[in-house]
Amino acid sequence: MSDLAREITPINIEEELKSSYLDYAMSVIVGRALPDVRDGLKPVHRRVLFAMNELGNDWNKPYKKSARVVGDVIGKYHPHGDSAVYDTIVRLAQDFSMRYMLVDGQGNFGSVDGDSAAAMRYTEVRMARISHELLADLDKETVDWVPNYDGTEMIPAVMPTKVPNLLVNGSSGIAVGMAWNIPPHNLTEIVNGCLALIENGNLTIDELMTYITGPDFPTGAIINGRAGIVQAYRTGRGSVYVRAKAEVEVDDKTSRETIIIVHELPYQVNKARLIEKIAELVKEKKVEGISALRDESDKDACRIVIEIKRGESGEIVLNNLYKHTQLQTTFGINMVALDNNQPKVMNLKDILDAFLLHRREVVTRRTVFELRKARDRAHILEGLAVALANIDPIIELIRHSDTPADAKAKLVARGWELGNVAAMLEKAGDDAARPEWLEPEFGIREGQYFLTEQQAQAILDLRLHKLTGLEHGKILEEYQSLLDLIAELLFILASPERLMEVIRDELLAVREQYGDERPPEISASSAEINIEDLITPEDVVVTLSHQGYVKYQPITDYEAQRRGGRGKSATRIKEENFVERLLVANTHDTILCFSTRGKVYWLKVYQLPEASRGARGRPIINLLPLEEGERITAILPVKEYADDKYVFFATADGTVKKTSLSAFSRPLSSGIRAINLKEGDELIGVDITDGSNEIMLFSDAGKVVRFNEGSAAPMQPMLMSSDDVDGDDESVIDAGNDDDGSDNGEGSESTESKGTFKGVRPMGRTAGGVRGIRLLNGDKVVSLIVPRGEGAILTATENGYGKGTALTEYPTKSRGTQGVRSIKVDEDGKVSIDQVDDTDQIMLITNGGTLVRTRVSEVSIIGRNTGGVRLIRTGEDETVVGLQRIAESYEEENDVMAIDGEVSEGTDTAPDAGSAAADPEE
């Protein structure tokens, strides 16, 4: 026990674990996982190709069963499972996995749909032609050899490849504690980069990138952006976006429907799973606008057809698919490889330099090998040439010898005349054909030639027909050609420039034989591409319904109608889903979407679904990250964010606020706070002002207050009727209880004396605002108007009556007052208001979804204290809920009569306030 105890050495378990783990990790990294930077092959790839080479499984020979190759690999070189080795062979034979296949397979080797290859007993393989370039000169001592796993065989430590395979075919995998992902490239470009580096070894990476533009994936597709490529080539790490090559076009069969055709997929994308994912997104309504999906691919080409619903934008649908599916993927580049048996992150130039250094070593070792072989052969031919020059005495010597050994000894023992050899060696040099192992006493000495035993044996083995004059000439000719070859080989070894010329010529031969001209297609990055460039600018009508459905329609969908017509249906509306917001914008405009919780979101008009008049559109909650219970209440089109412009807010409770437009110039996908609202309050209007505009607030009780948003100014006198006062002296400024809603100290107003106006100074985004109008009896503000020009104010009641009133009829007063009467309404009636010009047109929308477009010139201009005329015929339980001005530029050239409706020809004067709103004809 004591002897045994002395043999046990205590060690620290932490140190032992660390040491053992590092040994294991390096064993896996070097011996199993990482590719070598010189040949770009992992050990299993190298062993597969070597086994096929040893089997004579060449590209120009018959195929052999895959099982035969797998058996040789696992039996001699790679002691792992047969399935792992077969999977390696399968991948080397897949044209969608390898840019340049190294194995030529026959049978089912899988597909881009993820189908598995047939069992190895069914498939057959042989080396691809390009694989010979990886194994070329393997038998010329160009690389080191190492024992196999059991020491019974020798295998190459690296292949003497003529092809820069690491970049050409790429590599990916995971080792212990590290991973790598090197993309494939176009062989022509990589060779061109090598040639440029041979010409000028001081080229920078940026200069190399003029030859090597980027990865070239076997499945094609488009590399979206150069920034990731530049970063990866400079540092060894980066990422690129790979986008499917797709086209949006008109279906040839229908000549009307829009379709998306996908021709090429990103690298390593499973086509079947991609199609399943698209179908799943359509089913879950995460991607809308797709009516049909078909896979029309065959064995030669990929073709996925996506049919687009009528009215939807194919470009928008395609971009949504890029966002939500593997039609666009990220390829992370991590160029890690073994360099001198050490894992190393390498940039583009590092890899090319390592390959060229490997080629210099291979060509040098090959040249040394060929020089040795040439000298050995020339040494024999030199002896034969000397023998032929001394043929008679040599024959006489052989005839008088007792045994072959005696004849050999006599041939070696004396010197012989040089004959023709003297002239040949005088030109090439006495030692040109002298092997390194030759002792000094042999060869030319003192004007004679002393034969070696090898030469003497070759003379004795010479057949008699070689003594003819023709054969004599052939021996001398071969000897001379070997002398020339030796001179060339010596020149290669002596001249680095000539050595690089040899490498250059071999690279040119590889490019000529295997190169192709398909360059990687690299587009501008998504940040550089403006989707607006794909969208035709046009004026459209944007609608937002009560239940949150949004859409846009071309303005040309609505023809002008005579007033009193029933209009044309603008959307498929249920009773509870009437249109709440309607505006006219350009497809390139930005829509600021203001929510019930005082937040603002950004949308481009073209991001909204284009829908027909009968379609509901799409829930805006699918376009914006709205929280539960949050609803969009106001939308505002914006072209640019000027510093001298302001966003003016008005709420239903009469609060107003203005904030610089530039405060909303930085869109966030999650939205930002635009205004703090009191509980129960909501936005009813938002507009753009210049800081000194007139502001008009209209209540649902038919009242209006007009004030200047800027600094104080003297009050204008005005005449008022008894109807204007309505129980209070509304000309008196309400100076008390300003109800400052600001939560951050901004926007508070001091009490001001009578006879001055109170403006609205700019406030921060989170301010609550100040009072704009004093409301009575639960009234609500229904409209915010910023008067521009000399146009009239068009007012419409929910019963379909309306009128135009000149702006001069509305006096400028101070904010915070009750205002003056704008229109007579029923006790429970509501109104809609907008400013118009005589050349404009208006749209009226009802809660039943009916929309009518009529000319402003057909609406009477009358005073404030009147009820108006019939604008739209409403049905039973149908009320007007929206009014929108359409500028002169949208007006139709032709005077189009009412469509899908009737024109009232009876009395068109509104009934007195308080009476029934029925049509007098009824």
From Swiss-Prot:
Tell me where the signal peptide lies: none
EC number(s): the record gives: 5.6.2.2
The entry lists its GO molecular-function terms as: ATP binding; DNA binding; DNA negative supercoiling activity
User: Per UniProt, what is the name of the gene that codes for the protein in this document?
Assistant: gyrA
Regarding protein family, the annotation reads:
Belongs to the type II topoisomerase GyrA/ParC subunit family.
Residue window of motif GyrA-box: 561-567
Active site per UniProt? Y122 (o-(5'-phospho-dna)-tyrosine intermediate)
Keywords on record: ATP-binding, Cytoplasm, DNA-binding, Isomerase, Nucleotide-binding, Topoisomerase
List the biased-composition ranges (Acidic residues).
723-743
Instruction: List the record's Gene Ontology CC terms alphabetically.
Output: chromosome; cytoplasm; DNA topoisomerase type II (double strand cut, ATP-hydrolyzing) complex
Q: Where in the cell is it found?
A: Cytoplasm
List, for all copies, the residue spans of the domain called Topo IIA-type catalytic. 34-534
Q: What is the lineage of its organism?
A: Bacteria, Pseudomonadati, Pseudomonadota, Gammaproteobacteria, Aeromonadales
Q: What is this protein called?
A: DNA gyrase subunit A
Supply the CDD domains for this chain: TOP4c
Q: Anything further noted?
A: Few gyrases are as efficient as E.coli at forming negative supercoils. Not all organisms have 2 type II topoisomerases; in organisms with a single type II topoisomerase this enzyme also has to decatenate newly replicated chromosomes.
Region spans: Disordered: 715-763, 899-922
Q: How does it assemble?
A: Heterotetramer, composed of two GyrA and two GyrB chains. In the heterotetramer, GyrA contains the active site tyrosine that forms a transient covalent intermediate with DNA, while GyrB binds cofactors and catalyzes ATP hydrolysis.
Where does it mainly reside? cytoplasm
Taxonomically, the superkingdom here is Bacteria
Q: Which Gene3D superfamilies match?
A: 3.30.1360.40, DNA gyrase/topoisomerase IV, subunit A, C-terminal (2.120.10.90), Topoisomerase II, domain 5 (3.90.199.10), Topoisomerase, domain 3 (1.10.268.10)
Q: Which reaction does it catalyse?
A: ATP-dependent breakage, passage and rejoining of double-stranded DNA
What Pfam families does the record point to? DNA_gyraseA_C, DNA_topoisoIV
PROSITE patterns tied to this protein: TOPO_IIA
Please name the InterPro entries in this protein's record. Answer: GyrA, GyrA/parC_rep, Gyrase/topoIV_suA_C, Topo_IIA-like_dom_sf, Topo_IIA_A/C_ab, Topo_IIA_A_a_sf, Topo_IIA_dom_A, Type_II_DNA_Topoisomerases
